[in-house]
Amino acid sequence: MTIDSVKKMKDALCEKLKVSFGSTVEEANDAQMMRASALVLRDVMAERSVDTMRETREEHRRQVHYLSMEFLMGRSLMKNAFNLGVGEILTEALDELGFRAADIFESEPDAGLGNGGLGRLAACYLDSMTTLDIPAAGYSICYELGIFRQRIVDGQQVELPDNWKDLGGAWLLPKPQETETVCFGGTVRQFWDDGRLHVVPEGETEVLAIPCDMEIAGYGTDHVNTLRLWDAKSPTPLDMSLFSQGEYLRAQEQHAMAETIAKVLYPEDNHPEGKSLRLKQQYFFVSATVQSIVRKHIEVYGTAANFHEKNVIQINDTHPALVI
């Protein structure tokens, strides 16, 4: 998909508004146009990402896997348009369609995936590796609410949920077919069969790690890398036996506990429950990531013997240290 003119950009935006929102340009508001713009650019990056991954596999290039509990990505619309070389085209197309480009760019929320210096460092590394044509992937958790929005009420700070995915979710490409299963609790049984050691978890609680990919465009290159974000879901969304008995809250308890893992970045840990949740987040994130990396390596090479030759795992901080 190539968009090299204002007309092509306008046509693409109008088509996205129609098929994704059932809206015309005249009916669309700034939020819808922001999401339509993001979807158009995401389509371009998705095609380039497929080409990048195919080249990496065919050339058997070594890949960097960058793990961080946070990625402070900021706003992506203007950055991606600039990196893809369509910044002026998008700006002019929006203006000609009756929107102020500055308002559209400003309406995008910051992705609630990071907080401070560590998150910004991770985002910069990922941008730089992409610009340098280095095959790389970032990994983190797809936090539903980020940290919080701050409001001052009667001179006091009030923390409110940051629903960044309402608009920012346009950049996320769900990949449910690549879901991994993370096990918590239970016991482990080991046994030998046909000369091989088998390790079987028993009595565990399963949580599904569902990947949502965010494409990362490099500047002045067709190379596109991926930030893989793990969402947490329960394989059993509802206990029908409890629900049928009127135990509505208990029926959803397992589902709610699973989703808590990906609810917020850095939950308060000044109580035992908070400490437990942070540890669950770290284990969930690392387990899903390693399973994904190993699975993809085996699919390409058929063996783990050369894993160290084709993969480099880098951690940004101590939170994903379990990967070691």
Model-derived segments and their meaning:
Residues 1-324:
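A conserved ligand/cofactor-binding region detector
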